[in-house]
Structures are given as C-alpha cells and as structure tokens.
C-alpha cells in the first residue's frame, strides 16, 4: 500500500520517547486502533524503541485488521541485538566499524528486518527505512546493496532513510538520493511551519529523484496541538526540557501570528501545520507526535488523533504558505548534524566534516554551506 497523507508513529503516547505522560499499555494500544478507526492508514515503528517492544505493541494493536488496508513502515539500523550501547548516545549504528565489516552489512539487515516483521506479526513491510544513518549509511554501496536485497526478497516493497534524531543532514540526504537514485523511494525528514530550515534544501532533490517525503514533528514539540502554553510545566524527564529556555513562549507568539489563517478555514493549528507541510514539494505524508500532556488543562491524546485524521482537503494559497514560512523562519537557529562546515576532527556517528563530495552536492543544488548550514542565532 502507498503512503497516505496522515501517519501514526509508535513513538507517540510517551512509552518509548519521553514526550508527555506515558500511556498505560491498554490506552496505548487503544490509541493505535483509534487512529485506524478514524481513517489513518499509515503506521510506522522502529526496532530500537524499547528493544523491539514498540514493534510488538503495533502488531498487537493491528491484529485482526486486514494487512492490505494499511501502509506499514519499519525502521531499522541501530544494532539492538548485541545490546551494546554507546553511553547516552544509545545503540551503535549497524555500520559502526566496532561491530562489523561491510561484508556483514547485508546479513545484519536481513536479520533485523525479519526479526522486526516477526515481532509485528506479518511477513512484509510496505516501506523499510534506514534509521539515523552515519556517514557510511548514507553513502556506502555495500550497505545499500544489502537494503536492495531486502526488496528483492520481498520483505519490503520500498526503501528509504529516516535521518536524525537531531536536525541537519541536508547534504548527506541529497547525496543519498543521487547516489542511490531509483533505490531510495521515501525519506522521513524534519519539516514544518516552525522548522522550514534546513529541510527545505532537500525538497528539490527529492522531487528530481522521485523520492516521497514523510515530514515528522510537524507539531513542533507539541505546540501546534495548542495545549502547551507559556508557563507549561513538563513532566520529569520530558525531552523537551532540554530545549533552549523560552522556546514555548517564542513558539506560541509565532503561532498566534499564524492563527488567523487557521481561523479563515475553520481548522485547528495542528491541521494548519500539516496542510502547510503537505504543500511543500515532494511531501506526501505528515507524522506528528501525539502527546498526552500532564496537567488538568491538557487536551486528550485521542482528540489530537481525531484532528489529524480529520485533516481536510484544503489548499493554502501561495501567499498564505509564504506568510507562514516567513513567520516560522528558523534559519541559523541551531548547530546542525551530519556533514557541515562547523565540524572538524574525526567523524562521529551523527556529524562529520564537510567532504569534497558534499561540497560538490552543495554546489549542484545552490547551497552555500558556510552561509546556509551554520549557526547564527538562538531560536
């Protein structure tokens, strides 16, 4: 099954990523079923979430639902099987030289894909994405021959990448599209009204290479759900507490500038964020994080799912899209990851020096790395 405009990820609900309250097992499963019942037909999971538990939970939630009635997207790439963590950085990428040589890439990918499918309780993905690649994962021919073998074995119909978890990687993503053109079908990127940068640099290359984009975190840390206001108290351990001070206040001020456009169409702020994002070149699906905020005034997570499922078929005008982009412009607000000019030294799993190959990518696509991919100001 092909991608649908709206998608649901197993990181929603706070059990596997620390955003808001962690739902009970019963409510977590019910939310997935509720998403399906309301019309959401793309579901995404990653094997690294609680060492495969998210896969299992998704399989339980979808049990009994006809397999051909939804699009299933898997994500693999962090090697959870030896259980070797790199401290706070989490599990190593499967391409890490400390784990294996390139001639073992294909066997690892086959094993990881099969184990994920087994946990979900099905025999195939509609799409399988490479999770948070390092520089090897983006560019290594042997790694992508291993990915291609999964398609040949009919374990998946399509292939792609899911960069992250932080923002950046623009030139690496484009290089991957070009180097493996015809093999990379889909990619999940960070893109939304509050974060048009740097993801927008990827859009023309995606269109040229026929890559369909899935935009994550369009909700911008939950702000577009409209129940995170100035003075909001986050729960202990919530990932959002690590964001720069004042981000809630600054984000809400921008949302209020965008609100008249949502009011014109009678839509919610989440729906506005999704419609703006879907108006961007090559973006075919949006997958916000659904969060059950703590506190008495929070909106029920089920209501947030309803808003996504009810996304109307509205086309914002070009002027409205530009107004939203201008309000949310975040260029230069952070240090990016991936290949970028601010990094020097030995390559790390999530950032590396700007190579001559990446410089050439930048030149082909009109990107000046030192102007367009560097930190300039706080958000």
Over which residues does each language-model region extend?
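Conserved, mostly hydrophobic/aromatic
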Residues: 8, 28, 35, 43, ...
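Structured C-terminal cap/extension of enzyme domains
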Residues: 41, 204-379
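N-terminal binding-site loop/beta-alpha segment at the start of enzyme catalytic domains
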Residues: 1-74, 78-80, 365-379
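Short, flexible, mixed-charge acidic loops at enzyme active sites
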Residues: 22, 83-92, 227-235
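Acidic (Asp/Glu)-rich catalytic clusters
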Residues: 2-3, 37, 61-67, 71, ...
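Glycine/proline-rich, positively charged
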Residues: 17, 89-192
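Active-site beta-loop-alpha junctions enriched in small/polar residues
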Residues: 11-13, 48, 75-79, 130-135, ...
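Structural preference for beta-strand elements that scaffold enzyme active sites
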Residues: 3-7, 41-42, 69-73, 124-129, ...
């Amino acid at each position: 099954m092909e991608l649908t405009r709206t998608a649901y990820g197993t990181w929603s609900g706070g059990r596997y990523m620390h955003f808001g309250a962690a739902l009970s097992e019963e409510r977590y499963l019910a939310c997935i079923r509720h998403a399906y019942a309301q019309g959401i037909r793309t579901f995404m999971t990653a094997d690294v979430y609680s060492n495969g538990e998210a896969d299992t939970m998704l399989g339980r939630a979808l049990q009994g639902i006809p397999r051909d009635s939804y699009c299933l997207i898997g994500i693999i790439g962090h090697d959870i099987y030896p259980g070797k963590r790199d401290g706070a950085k989490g599990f190593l990428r499967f391409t890490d030289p400390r784990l294996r040589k390139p001639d073992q890439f294909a066997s690892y990918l086959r094993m990881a894909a099969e184990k994920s499918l087994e946990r979900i309780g099905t025999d195939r993905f509609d799409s399988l994405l490479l999770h948070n690649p390092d520089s090897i994962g983006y560019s290594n021919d042997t790694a992508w021959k291993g990915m291609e073998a999964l398609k040949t074995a009919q374990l998946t119909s399509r292939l792609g990448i899911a960069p992250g978890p932080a923002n950046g990687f623009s030139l690496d993503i484009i290089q991957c599209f070009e180097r493996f053109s015809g093999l990379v079908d889909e990619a999940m990127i960070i893109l939304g009204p509050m974060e048009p940068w740097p993801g927008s640099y990827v859009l023309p290359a995606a269109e040229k290479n026929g890559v369909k984009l899935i935009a994550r975190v369009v909700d911008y840390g939950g702000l577009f759900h409209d129940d995170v206001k100035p003075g909001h108290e986050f729960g202990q351990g919530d990932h959002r507490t690590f964001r720069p001070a004042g981000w809630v206040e600054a984000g809400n001020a921008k949302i209020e500038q965008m609100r008249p456009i949502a009011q014109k169409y009678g839509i919610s702020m989440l729906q506005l964020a999704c419609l703006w994002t879907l108006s961007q070149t090559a973006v075919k699906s949006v997958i916000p994080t659904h969060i059950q905020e703590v506190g008495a005034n929070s909106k029920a997570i089920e209501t947030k799912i309803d808003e996504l499922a009810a996304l109307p078929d509205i086309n914002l005008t070009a002027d409205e899209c530009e107004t939203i982009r201008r309000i949310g412009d975040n260029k230069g607000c952070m240090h990016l990851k991936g290949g970028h000019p601010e990094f020097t030294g030995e390559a790390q799993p999530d950032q590396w020096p700007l190579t001559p190959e990446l410089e050439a990518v930048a030149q082909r696509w009109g990107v000046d790395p030192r102007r367009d991919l560097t930190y300039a100001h706080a958000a």
